[in-house]
Regions:
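Short alpha-helical segment of the dimerization/phosphotransfer core of two-component systems
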Residues: 55-63
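Conserved micro-motifs of the catalytic ATP-binding
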Residues: 75-80, 119-122
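Conserved catalytic submotifs in the C-terminal HATPase_c
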Residues: 81-85, 103, 108-118
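Short helix-loop "hinge" at the ATP-lid/N-box region of the Bergerat-fold HATPase_c
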Residues: 138-139
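Short beta-strand/loop element within the Bergerat-fold HATPase_c
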Residues: 145-157
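Short conserved segment of the HATPase_c
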Residues: 170-184
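Glycine-rich ATP-binding loops of the HATPase_c
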Residues: 211-217
Length: 235
């Protein structure tokens, strides 16, 4: 029954949101109460307390923004705005925007592209969302050599974007589930590094609406996510 199924989805969604918000709310409340009660008047400790509150509030804000984006895409409230744009220029901009965060974690992002320009036909804003979520996911799970490689290749009329990060492979049994909302392969690590299990579900929603391929491949020394774009000349 469709009504029963929708109620189950709604209940599961609310349960997941409540679970995700519980930890940051508890941390914010605990550290705010500590500041109010004057547990420490040491400036360094007070600065640390304030830092935790700001970080956790930022995580909640980020999660709410992603949920709103996902809701708009899944329920068809946002139409694709198709246009021709340079995917190399877009990726260069996104990589530059993420270099500071990556370097703070000792991670190097490499985007060594031979082609200076590759035009694609898509919704530039949505594709920016896809690339950003892939790179964010790579930063959150990068390990071992601490390296992320972004590359673009032409495959017939399509253009494929790859985002590879060194680190642990995704267990094969988890791969079909990683595109689901709130799904986390390594819950302890995800909490530590700031993931919320929503980014890849946004990728899936966008690529499904666009009708192009996307996926993930385990490599010998890491994991590679990819997606395809229309590279045919359009007027």
């Amino acid at each position: 029954d469709r009504k029963v199924k929708m109620e189950e989805v709604r209940t599961e969604f609310l349960s997941n949101v409540s679970h995700e918000l519980k930890t940051p709310i508890a941390l914010i409340q605990g550290y705010a109460e500590g500041l109010k009660e004057g547990i420490s008047d040491d400036p360094e400790s007070m600065d640390f307390y304030c830092g935790v509150i700001i970080d956790e509030a930022g995580k909640m804000n980020n999660m709410v923004k992603k949920l709103l984006t996902l809701n708009q895409i899944e329920f068809g409230n946002e139409e694709l705005v198709m246009e021709r744009f340079d995917i190399i220029e877009l990726i260069t901009s996104i990589v530059n925007a993420n270099e500071l965060r990556a370097s703070q974690k000792g991670i190097q992002i490499e985007f060594n592209q031979r082609d200076e320009h590759i035009d694609v036909w898509s919704d530039e804003y949505k594709i920016e969302e896809v690339v950003t979520n892939y790179i964010t996911n790579a930063i959150n799970h990068c390990d071992f050599e601490n390296r992320i490689e972004v590359s673009v290749e032409r495959i017939g009329d399509d253009v494929r974007v790859h985002v590879f990060n060194t680190g642990k492979n995704i267990p094969e049994e988890d791969i079909p589930n990683i595109w689901q909302k709130f799904y986390k392969v390594d819950k302890a690590r995800t909490r530590e590094y700031g993931g919320n299990g929503i980014g890849l579900s946004i990728v899936k929603a966008i690529m499904d609406s666009y009708g192009k391929g996307f996926g993930v491949i385990n490599k010998s020394n890491g994991v590679e996510f990819w997606f395809d774009l229309d590279g045919k000349a359009m007027v």
